[in-house]
C-alpha cells in the first residue's frame, strides 16, 4: 500500500460494505464514497446536504443488506441504497447510537432503546433491565449491556 493515496485525510466516518468494500463520509465536501476491495471508487454521492435537503453532521454509519444508514442526531437516520441513492429519513432524532439488524433498526435515544420497524414504520420501546450501562448491543436474541466492570447478557424477545 506504499504510495497509495485515496485522498481520505479528512474522512470523518467509515463502515464496511458488501463484497469487501467500504463507505467513507467526507464532512468537508459532504460526500459519500464507496470503495471496492481493490480500493477503486465504485459509487460517489456529492453534496449530501443538497441531496437530503438539510445540513447534516452524521456521527455513525452502518451498512446492512446493501442499505447504508447515516445516524444524524439532529434529523434522524438517513437511508441510502447500495448505489448511494437517497431513499428515506427515519425521523427519530437524538440517537447516540444505532444498530441495524434483520428485524429492525435499534436506536439508543436519551438512555432509551427504541426499535424501528422499516416495514410497518412503527417504533416500540425496549425496556432495559438496568440503568447503569456504557453501551448496548443486540445479537442473536440476546441483549448485551456493557458496564464498567461487567457485561450483562439478557434474553431478548424483540
Specify the residue positions occupied by each region the protein language model found.
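Repeated scaffold domains used in trafficking and secretory/extracellular systems
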Residues: 7-19, 52-65, 92-103, 130-141
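Conserved beta-propeller blade signature
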Residues: 22-24, 67-70, 104-107, 142-145
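Loop/turn-rich, solvent-exposed surfaces of beta-rich toroidal or solenoidal domains
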Residues: 70-75, 80, 87-115
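Blade-level signature of beta-propeller repeat domains, shared across WD40, Kelch, NHL, RCC1
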Residues: 130-158
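Short loop/turn segments that connect beta-strands within beta-propeller blades
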Residues: 36-40, 80-85, 117-121, 156-158
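WD40 beta-propeller blade core
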Residues: 31-33, 78, 114, 152-153
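Short loop/turn segments immediately following the C-termini of beta-strands
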Residues: 27-29, 72-73, 110, 148-150
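A short beta-strand motif characteristic of beta-propeller blades
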Residues: 1-6, 40-53, 83-90, 121-128
Amino acid at each position: 500500500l506504499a504510495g497509495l493515496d485515496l485522498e481520505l485525510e479528512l474522512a470523518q466516518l467509515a463502515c464496511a460494505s458488501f463484497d469487501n468494500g467500504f463507505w467513507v463520509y467526507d464532512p468537508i465536501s459532504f460526500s459519500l464514497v464507496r470503495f471496492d476491495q481493490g480500493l477503486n471508487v465504485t459509487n460517489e454521492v456529492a453534496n449530501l446536504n443538497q441531496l437530503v435537503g438539510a445540513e447534516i453532521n452524521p456521527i455513525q454509519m452502518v451498512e446492512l443488506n446493501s442499505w447504508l444508514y447515516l445516524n444524524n442526531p439532529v434529523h434522524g437516520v438517513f437511508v441510502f441504497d447500495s448505489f448511494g441513492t437517497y431513499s428515506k429519513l427515519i425521523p427519530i432524532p437524538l440517537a447516540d447510537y444505532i444498530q441495524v439488524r434483520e428485524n429492525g433498526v435499534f436506536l439508543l435515544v436519551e438512555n432509551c432503546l427504541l426499535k424501528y420497524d422499516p416495514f410497518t414504520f412503527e417504533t416500540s420501546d425496549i425496556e432495559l433491565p438496568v440503568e447503569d450501562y456504557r453501551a448496548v448491543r443486540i445479537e442473536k436474541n440476546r441483549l448485551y449491556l456493557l458496564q464498567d466492570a461487567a457485561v450483562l447478557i439478557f434474553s431478548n424477545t424483540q
